[in-house]
Amino acid sequence: MLEKFTVIRGKAVPLRGEDIDTDRILPARFMKVLTFEGLGQYLFYDERFDEKGNPKPHPLNDPRYRGATILLVESGFGSGSSREHAPQAIKRAGFKAIIGESFAEIFFGNATAIGLPCVSLAPEDLGVLFRSVEENPELEVEIDLVNKEVRFGDRTAPLFIREEAREALVEGLWDPIGELLEAGELLDQFDRKLPYPRRTE
């Protein structure tokens, strides 16, 4: 059974900047892998480390945000190439959800398909959330996909997400391949009803 995403809670890390593309999220040279395992360590690598591998000032290197599981972004996040490695790197770095103003369409789809919810807030609400987290890194942020709300401090803001994506995440139907694997016996039954030659093993 795939995980059902109803309420996601955690600390957040603010990442300012519009139109952050997938090349920045995960530099292309780190895509030469056979699996997605370990991609999290290369998240925003060129912005977090210099050519010698020394840390640079960056929100993801800031100890105040250590342990954050929600990524705050601005508009146009995930633009550029359609590489699915980008959302994989974010998820494998420990993030459970992304809150932003808007997302590139292909990135949004790739993220949803691996169980990484991307929800949008109105610019005013997002601005308040950014400032709140920057002022208080320990602030707990709550994403309620059932009631379509983001809660933090004493504030509640409506979230926006495509309804089909929200339903898939809430019902645990976000991974088509996973659904097929879980439906093994049903597929076998269907296969036996087909008129053409079928596998016998």
Swiss-Prot record:
Enzyme class: lyase
Keyword Cytoplasm: no
Catalytic activity field: (2R,3S)-3-isopropylmalate = (2S)-2-isopropylmalate
Entry's Gene Ontology cellular component terms: 3-isopropylmalate dehydratase complex
UniProt keyword terms in alphabetical order: Amino-acid biosynthesis, Branched-chain amino acid biosynthesis, Leucine biosynthesis, Lyase
GO biological processes: L-leucine biosynthetic process
PANTHER family: 3-ISOPROPYLMALATE DEHYDRATASE SMALL SUBUNIT (PTHR43345:SF5), 3-ISOPROPYLMALATE DEHYDRATASE SMALL SUBUNIT 2-RELATED-RELATED (PTHR43345)
Protein name as annotated: 3-isopropylmalate dehydratase small subunit
Protein source organism: Thermus thermophilus (strain ATCC 27634 / DSM 579 / HB8)
Source lineage: Bacteria, Thermotogati, Deinococcota, Deinococci, Thermales
Gene name of this polypeptide: leuD
